[in-house]
């Protein structure tokens, strides 16, 4: 396992305070489950049809296309001017299962690097087959992309603008072999 100090991926020495916090949080999680979680047959149907697209920011359209289409093999499906910001590019990649990953560039705006703040995207987890996972991991390493964290058949790494991504060889609707949908 690899990790970064100061990030949620750090897996170093565990302190007594962390053990105490985990024990406290486990009790909180159980209360939340009892209060809000319903068995599969008892849950209402979702009002959503799915994710239309998730939009991230790009500082360099060409570099973003080379990374997502060239390395991760997500086909570019459309590119046009952003309707909300003249001169801005809005472009889309197919990430499977009728889901799109979109990007904007905002020329002329002074945007800072990716930061983890409340309400922001922590990471985007994308499911692939085991064979594809090994293939894409090799392509990432060959391209010099650092694997930030690894656990079993899951790897975390950063995209061209620091966006945190996860590739995992686990079926949709499962997490650590456990159904989540």
Residue ranges and their predicted role:
Residues 101-104, 166:
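Conserved beta-strand in the GNAT
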Residues 38-40, 78, 87, 108-113:
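A short, acidic/glycine-rich surface segment
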């Amino acid at each position: 396992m690899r990790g970064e100090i100061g990030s949620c991926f750090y897996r170093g020495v565990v302190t007594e305070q962390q053990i105490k916090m985990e024990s406290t949080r486990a009790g909180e999680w159980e209360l939340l489950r009892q209060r809000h979680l319903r068995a599969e047959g008892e849950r209402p149907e979702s009002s959503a049809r799915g994710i239309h697209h998730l939009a991230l920011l790009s500082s360099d359209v060409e570099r973003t296309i080379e990374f997502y289409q060239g390395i991760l093999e997500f086909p570019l499906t459309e590119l046009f001017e952003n309707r909300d910001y003249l001169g801005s590019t809005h472009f889309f990649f197919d990430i499977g299962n009728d889901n799109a990953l979109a990007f904007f560039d905002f020329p002329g705006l002074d945007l800072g690097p990716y930061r983890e703040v409340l309400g922001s995207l922590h990471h985007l987890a994308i499911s692939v087959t085991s064979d594809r996972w090994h293939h894409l991991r090799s392509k990432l390493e060959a391209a010099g992309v650092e694997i930030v964290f690894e656990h079993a058949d899951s790897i975390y790494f950063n995209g061209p603008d620091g966006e945190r991504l996860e590739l995992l060889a686990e079926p949709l609707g499962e997490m650590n072999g456990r159904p989540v949908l």
